[in-house]
């Protein structure tokens, strides 16, 4: 990519969901942009070509005329930057499927906010396993797809171990109303995005159960403490927790009804427990299970996360979880 600094990098966004579409729209709005949105189904790509929109996920929002739509893996050939914008649990299969078409010099960026449930791995670790030799980054922070695609001011974080690469990515992907801050803390940025979804579910449960705003405030602050302990124990930086990908994303996701994780929690709070065999699990539901398991193995105290995991798994109802949290031994904050 550095060798093509005078021309626009070729960017391919894999995943034509709301977030992938929004990111492709921002990137394609720049001068001399070379951006392709890669959909899983040709029907989806064809509809975007026909209408200039992706009404299935972002109804009524026009997309830049220069944005290219495809469903063919060949679109990845010679890509400088590849954004993986599919759900966390689909990353490994997508990497295996598209990997042969991704060049050795490409930078691959995960844009999902979760961890792999079966292994507990960070998504960058999954991509490094499946795409050996590629440089891997992560994009995260407080940004809803509809806001980004509509041109509302949004700031997020892009992280890579090499700060020069993170800066290069930030410059390539930032737009007039979309600002990316580079970071070298790939671990902290990823875990902030995953754990804030868990805490958003907890805040939704509080809202759905009618427990009041004071309880929500307590969950946000105590949840932030849990997030910090977990991130630092996993090798991330405490400063990251206080930034956009930690506190910033937590505040947004735990307070806005645009958040699927918050809405999922509200439904849990109203019903008392998760529906058995629910197929509508959100990222935070998977992350809660993984984080609780890893925290137990590492001896990290995360009572809110453990309670969310137990409720989602149907092992505990909301009232019992609340009683457990409120009856914990009194300790210094």
Swiss-Prot record:
EC id: 1.1.1.94
Domain of life of the native organism: Bacteria
An annotated GO cellular component: cytosol
Keyword entries, A-Z: Cytoplasm, Lipid biosynthesis, Lipid metabolism, NAD, NADP, Nucleotide-binding, Oxidoreductase, Phospholipid biosynthesis, Phospholipid metabolism
SUPFAM superfamilies in UniProt: 6-phosphogluconate dehydrogenase C-terminal domain-like, NAD(P)-binding Rossmann-fold domains
Reaction equation(s) it catalyzes: sn-glycerol 3-phosphate + NAD(+) = dihydroxyacetone phosphate + NADH + H(+); sn-glycerol 3-phosphate + NADP(+) = dihydroxyacetone phosphate + NADPH + H(+)
Record-level GO BP terms: carbohydrate metabolic process; glycerol-3-phosphate biosynthetic process; glycerol-3-phosphate catabolic process; glycerophospholipid metabolic process; phospholipid biosynthetic process
Claim: Lipid biosynthesis is one of the keywords in the record: yes
Active site location: 196
Record pathway: Membrane lipid metabolism; glycerophospholipid metabolism
Predominant location: cytoplasm
GO molecular function, one term: NAD binding
One Pfam family named in its UniProt record: NAD_Gly3P_dh_N
InterPro entries documented for this protein: 6-PGluconate_DH-like_C_sf, 6PGD_dom2, G3P_DH_NAD-dep, G3P_DH_NAD-dep_C, G3P_DH_NAD-dep_N, NAD(P)-bd_dom_sf
Residue numbers binding NADPH: 19, 40-41, 113, 145, 260, 282-283
Compartments where located: Cytoplasm
Positions contributing to sn-glycerol 3-phosphate binding: 113, 141, 196, 249, 259-261
Stated role: Catalyzes the reduction of the glycolytic intermediate dihydroxyacetone phosphate (DHAP) to sn-glycerol 3-phosphate (G3P), the key precursor for phospholipid synthesis.
Protein family (similarity comment): Belongs to the NAD-dependent glycerol-3-phosphate dehydrogenase family.
Name under which the protein is recorded: Glycerol-3-phosphate dehydrogenase [NAD(P)+]
Species for this entry: Rhizobium meliloti (strain 1021) (Ensifer meliloti)
């Amino acid at each position: 990519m550095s060798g093509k600094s005078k021309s626009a990098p070729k960017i391919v966004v894999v995943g034509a969901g709301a977030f992938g579409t929004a990111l492709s729209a921002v990137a394609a709005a720049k001068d001399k942009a070379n951006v392709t949105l890669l959909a899983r189904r040709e029907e989806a790509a064809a509809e975007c070509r026909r209408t200039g929109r992706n009404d299935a996920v972002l109804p009524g929002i026009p997309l830049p005329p220069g944005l290219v739509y495809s469903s063919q893996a060949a679109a990845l050939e010679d890509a400088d930057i590849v954004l993986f914008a599919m759900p966390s649990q689909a990353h490994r299969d997508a990497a295996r499927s598209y990997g042969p078409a991704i060049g050795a010099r490409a930078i691959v960026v995960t844009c999902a906010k979760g961890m792999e449930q079966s292994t507990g791995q960070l998504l960058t670790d999954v991509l490094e396993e499946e795409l050996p030799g590629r440089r891997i980054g992560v994009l995260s922070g407080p940004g809803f797809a509809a806001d980004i695609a509509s041109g509302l001011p949004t700031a997020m974080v892009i992280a890579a171990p090499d700060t020069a690469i993170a800066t290069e990515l930030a410059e390539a992907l930032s737009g007039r109303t979309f600002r990316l801050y580079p970071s070298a803390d790939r671990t902290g940025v990823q875990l902030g995005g995953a754990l804030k979804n868990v805490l958003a579910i907890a805040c939704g449960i509080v809202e759905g159960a009618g427990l009041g705003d004071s309880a929500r405030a307590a969950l946000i602050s105590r949840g932030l403490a849990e997030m910090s302990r977990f991130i630092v124990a996993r090798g991330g930086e405490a400063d990251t927790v206080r930034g956009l990908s930690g506190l910033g994303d937590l505040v947004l996701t735990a307070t806005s009804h645009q958040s699927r994780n918050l809405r999922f929690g509200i439904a849990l709070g109203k019903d008392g427990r998760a529906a058995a065999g629910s197929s509508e699990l959100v990222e935070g539901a998977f992350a809660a299970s993984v984080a609780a398991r890893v925290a137990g193995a590492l001896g990290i105290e995360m009572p809110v996360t453990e309670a969310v995991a137990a409720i989602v798994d149907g092992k505990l109802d909301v009232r019992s979880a609340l009683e457990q949290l409120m009856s914990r031994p009194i300790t210094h904050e």
